Amino acid sequence: MDKFLIKGPCKIKGQVSISGSKNAALPILASTILFDKTVIIENLPRVKDIDTMVNLLKYLGSKIQFLNNKKTVKITKNKKQKIFAPYSLVKTMRAGILVLGPMIAKYHKSVTSLPGGCLIGARPVNYHLNALKKFGMIYEIKKGYIHATSKGKLKGTNIKFSNISVGATENSIIAACLAKGKTILKNCAIEPEIKNDLINFLNKAGAKIKWTGKRTCQIIGVNSLKETKYSVMGDRIETGTFCVAATLAKGDLLIKNFNPKLIQTELNLLKKTGATIKTSKDEIHIKGPQKIKNISNIVTKEYPNSLATDLQAQFMVLLCKANGRSTITESIFENRFMHVAELRRLGAKIIIKDNKAIIEGNTEFLGAELMSSDLRASAALVLAAIVAKGQSVINRIYHLDRGYEKIENKLRKIGVDIKRLS
């Protein structure tokens, strides 16, 4: 099992190019189940979750051709299509549930394994199931599988999500594209991966989707979607991770291929810690401060209201080095402080009270052997090791490989002493 060896502290300097967005690419790939025509998706990140989704589509009957060093995929439908998404392909990836909506919309039946992914809270699928039930889906769960059918074409409906859910919003939008009539979705997630990418992709293919309010989406069903080519947006969380790295390590970093407007909340927080930030259309130039300022009362919330939950762990590492006490409240997931125990091994002084982390600053990290627990926690451990004194070993980095494209190569180019060991 691979691990990282990092020798710190490291100074970050140079430039990094952001890969395509995993969280945008996954629902776009799942939605290709709706198509009879060829679809070409460009700017894919080369990460494990993308490989898993592509393998799932291949298993279901799509013909897959990789181009441009696997950053582009050409997807063509075979005549024979399966409606069974097995546990072996869905168990490692939360986004596996996203094939349920398009399969029901296209084929009116599906047997889909309950999904896996990072073990950060319950992350219930009931939001997906309750929404798809409104379209006319009938289902039962047996032995870890969702057995679903519909009596012919799905019917447009009105749905107000009881909680804002990224996955349920995506599944509902995708399913509604081929449903009969009009669908109104209220209290939708409006992350850029949905609003700027999934919907743009589907509309380019002939779907009829528009926003009628801040969190209200209208979809008019169509009979079919046309052949299309689309390039996935840059990865918002990778961008945020590198922004934190530069701030943490007193760096001077130019981040390319990402629209800074899509991460403005996090950039504003980094400015509060003392970072100097200049932006242009698709670049961020960030310089870390000599002394990091603390921040009180950060709360993770749904986009765009506050810090993204996927960047909470990275910001916690940054605040360990700040000049005073900081707090982070995690309001999205109930079990997303699993990185804290590992940060304590490096010397962090963090107290957890329910869903709030109280972080004492001025921590001198000392290298240690660490264990990754999930994707974003793994990134946080890498950041901490970069500024720790001495050698750190990070185990179970397969979590990182699920969401970051060759992160060690990118870090090495900007000054980090990092090696992958097998």
Locate the predicted segments by residue.
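Short, structured segments at the rim of ligand-binding sites
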Residues: 1-422
